[in-house]
Amino acid sequence: MAETEKIEIMNFDQDGYLEDGRNLVETGKLMCDLADKVADEGYDAVFLMGVGGTWDELMQLEYLMNKFGDRDLEVYLIHAAEWNVSGHKRMTSNSVVLTASESGTTPEVLEAVKKMKSMGVRVIAMTSPEGPIGQAVGADMCVKMASDHGAGGCEKGYYLADCFGLRLLNRRGCFPKYDLFIEQTKDIWKDMLDIRKKFEPTAEALAKKYALAPYTMFIGSGALWGETILFSMCILEEMQWKRTRYISSADFFHGTLELVEEGVPVVLFKGEDEKR
């Protein structure tokens, strides 16, 4: 394959990424405060709402909250476009919704937020307070998700969402090591840079070998299932027009296996949880 352009993982503002990380730790404290506010007020159910990539990102929090939560905790992952046409019978004025929009203009999320607010539902948004969604939610219920330097990836959204969700669990007595989680992740941004640097040669080799494959399969599970979908759909299909097939490890042997043949790359996302 002739190389027409060289793309490097580390070709971004690394100092800016680290600065964003430091700022994000402070922003995470705001998410913790919002979780405390919700816990103090009380709630009957937690809804995690996204569309496209944000829906994929929130999937890991749904997994964690259901894994560590008590039997009375109700957590639902909802797709904004689907909720707009079908609603959800368990959503009441005592429910709380966490959503996200880096642009602040996602049409489906904006429509849903307006409807939810009219129902008296509390909505917390990871978005700019100046955007349409932020204005609909209210500045006091917004935490800015977008990075100031345009560097990095979904890990920033993951971090903020987890600060909120895991704090709710902590307040229920279900996640006692919340403070340890915050302490151990405060410097993770440097580690993320180191991982990128170490993976650069491998990434280049994989890209050269598989870039022109007719389509590629991605298998994931557990906390990584949402990331499996996001990488396949948002990174490869949407951004690079690559044909992909994402499948859960639980379902792989019930159909998709029959399509594995010579020339079709299969990528396995190997997590650290019980579904690995």
Regions found by a protein language model. Give the residues of each.
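Conserved N-terminal alpha-helical segment that immediately precedes and caps sugar-phosphate-binding
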Residues: M1-R276
